[in-house]
Amino acid sequence: MAFDNEFTLGIEEEFQIIDPETRELRSRVNEMLEEGRMLLGEQIKPEMHQSMVEVGTGICNNIKEARRDVIHLRRTIAELAYKNGLAIAAASTHPISHWADQRITEHERYAQLIEEIQHPARALLIFGLHVHVGIQDKEAAIAIMNAARYFLPHVLALSTSSPFWIKQNTGLKSYRSEVFKQFPRTDIPDYYNSWSEFENYVNLLIKTGCIDNGRKIWWDVRPHPFFPTLEFRVCDIPSKVDETICIAALFQSIVAKLYKLFRQNLGFRLYRRALIQENKWRAVRYGLDGKLIDFGKQKEVPVRSLLLELLEFIDDVVDELDCREEVNYLHTIIENGNSADRQLRVFKQTGDLRDVVDGLMRETVEGIFQVA
């Protein structure tokens, strides 16, 4: 099956803006935006807290193109930060800084969010990775979303980067996930029997004043309300470019594999949200060191083993997508650990969260200035 520009990619990363002297967050995104918009146009934007900057790739035809774009974006905002005496870091929580010390961006959207959601919105000082995979067929998109839910805890465990929160070791590998759960319409979605059933759900929420559009459905995976993509939102932002690219390639491959099964009328067993939620909690708590439940076998299996099984599951599509090298980086993450693991190792060695921040700042720009 030739894919022919199916499964295009878009990657959004949200970065911390840091004072490299104090290692604290700084609400200074506006100092980066004027020149940033000249260089990147709509690819750079502020978020609710002014200590965050978001960048997003264009529509990429393959993972190689996505890598070039991600590196270019990281390099550009790192240089913008440096010009202003700042630095950037990629992790889903800041180890030290408090949300109450960050300024809120003046924008009607954020004012409305805070008015509606109150404290959970003000405290939403978390940073994410969103991966869009193109899919034109709406019925296929819903079927793929239903099946892809099963793999969300697996990839979350691979990505975890938020063990610390306001100077505390939370004991979780992805504290970001717990912070975001305080918002409505988040977490693992239920499954839908058709596009029309999903559309009826969205229209009901709009009709009854719950939301004004589908953008306020913040599930871990969702059909994008305005673009023909499935948007994967479950992951922490990895610190290293190679990790981001590996995760994006995994999501692209999962979509391509499930689409292939859909076209062949081969079913994929759908599990209830409550069951997948059990696995998500395990990924949040333990990351790569945990065990997930294999629901078919009704037993616990180490995350690392399940990730290797995931590689086998997608093996027959990765060459057509030209992403074998990128998904195989999973072996490196399994062997060496992810951002959360490295942060915890540094803290165990030095006992100083400033050293953790230093490591994040280094890893975020690792290798990006050696690439033309």
PLM regions and their residue ranges:
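C-terminal accessory/tail domains of diverse enzymes
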Residues: 1-84, 113, 180-372
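Metal-dependent DNA replication initiation modules
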Residues: 91, 95, 108, 113-129, ...
